[in-house]
Amino acid sequence: MKPIVSIIMGSTSDLPVMEKAAKLLDEMQVPFEMNALSAHRTPAEVETFAKGAAERGIKVIIAAAGMAAALPGVIAANTTLPVIGVPVKGSVLDGVDALYSIIQMPPGIPVATVAINGAMNAAILAVQMLALADAELAQKFAAYKEGLKNKIVKANEELKEVKYAYKTN
């Protein structure tokens, strides 16, 4: 099985955040790979990865980084594939530095950016992109969204049972 999504993180310290993306891709049965590459420590390897990703069959790249967070932008500069950036909380600025680094890209080098530590939404966005050309995946994703809706419906039913003197519903 060949991966169609690549999850790249600046270091394995980002793994606890990025596992959420991996679990969602696994649940949706989307083949993926996970690797650590650093825009600052392994710049040549990042360039090689980005330039060869499409040829290897990758369709979407999810790139996570904290602090200066150059990784998603460097990857985007070296590929025509969509890149989804995940700013990782981990510095004294609670990930805001990473968010600004990833979201402030120059024209022509976009990185679709999710919330700080938003790996789950990054995977969801990747699945939505892939589902445009994959009817089976689109059905799986629709079922996933229906499940999210059902959780809220159930929660509201449970909240009806919560009693307070001045609660009106």
Where are the model-predicted features located?
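Glycine-rich phosphate-binding loop
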Residues: 49-87
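Glycine/small-residue-rich loop that forms an oxyanion/phosphate-binding "nest" at active or ligand-binding sites
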Residues: 67, 78-102, 107
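Short glycine/serine/threonine-rich phosphate/pyrophosphate-binding segments
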Residues: 14-18, 42-46, 65-74, 93-96, ...
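Short beta->alpha connector loops at strand-helix junctions that form conserved
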Residues: 9, 65, 86-89, 114-115
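Glycine-rich phosphate/diphosphate-binding loop of Rossmann-like nucleotide-binding domains
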Residues: 2-41
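C-terminal binding/interaction regions
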Residues: 3, 9-16, 20, 96-169
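N-terminal beta-loop-helix "entrance" segment that forms/cooperates
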Residues: 34-55
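Structural motif
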Residues: 4-7, 33, 59-61, 81-84, ...
